[in-house]
Structure formats: structure tokens, C-alpha cells
Amino acid sequence: LFPYTTLFRSLIKENLRYTLVIRQPDFVGEDGVCAALERTKHRKQNPLLEEVRFGTVPGETCVQLLHVGAYDDEPVSFAKMDEFVHAHSLTRAEDCHREIYLNNATRTEKNRLKTILRYRVK
């Protein structure tokens, strides 16, 4: 099972905009996902099911870091990433970033959470 990913489009906590991404194995195609989604819609009504879509994420040049600790402490890790970007004459391509969660946040102590932080650079 692949870890789930969140693509954050806003960095302001009070106005979070994000997309949840669940990577699929290579043998799972769009037809299979759409068929499973239709079966799910018939069993259980949920308006959010209309927002589910299948897509691909293109490869990109990124900077990433393994953050260990509470989500609220991520700004320290982002500062380290920004220093690295500056030291290597790169620039951040956009304000959004990805977070890949390696632990279950409901079962892991906050100070032991592991999250890969990633953003695009140019």
C-alpha cells in the first residue's frame, strides 16, 4: 500500500486548499478506478464521490526533506529546504507543496511523525 499524499495549494491554515492523492499500482488503470467508483456510488451516497478523479502526476524537479515531528513544526523544515534552494541557485517554482505521510497520525506520537515535504524548483 502506497502512502497517501496531500498537495497543498495554500499555506495559510485558515484557508487551506488541498488535494488528496492516493498512488495506484501500475496495473490499476483509469477504467478499473472508474468502475470501482461507480460501484461505490451505488452502495453509499456521498457528494464527495463526485470529486474523485483519476489522473497522472508528471515528473518534476523538486527539493524534498524528511520532516520528523509535529505538523505544526514543519516551517523549520521548510526553512532548511529554502536555504538549500538558495545555496544551489534554484528558485521555488510555486507556493504549493506536497506532503507524503509515512505514519498513521492517529497512532503515532506527534514528535515521531514522519512526513516527506516536497516542492517544485527551477
Sequence positions of predicted segments:
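Short, small-residue-biased leader/transition segments that mark boundaries at the very start
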Residues: F2-L7
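Extracellular-facing segments of soluble proteins and assemblies that are Gly/Ser/Thr-biased and enriched
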Residues: L11-G32
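A mid-sequence, solvent-exposed acidic-amphipathic segment
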Residues: V33-D73
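Long, well-ordered alpha-helical scaffolding segments within enzyme catalytic domains
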Residues: E38-H42, Y71-A93
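A short, hydrophobic, proline-anchored segment that marks a local hinge/packing element in signaling
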Residues: I22, I116-K122
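Beta-rich nucleic-acid/ligand-interaction surfaces
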Residues: D95-L113
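Short connector loops at helix/strand junctions that flank enzyme active sites
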Residues: K13-R17, E60, R112
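Aromatic/basic-lined ligand-recognition segments
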Residues: F8, L113-T115
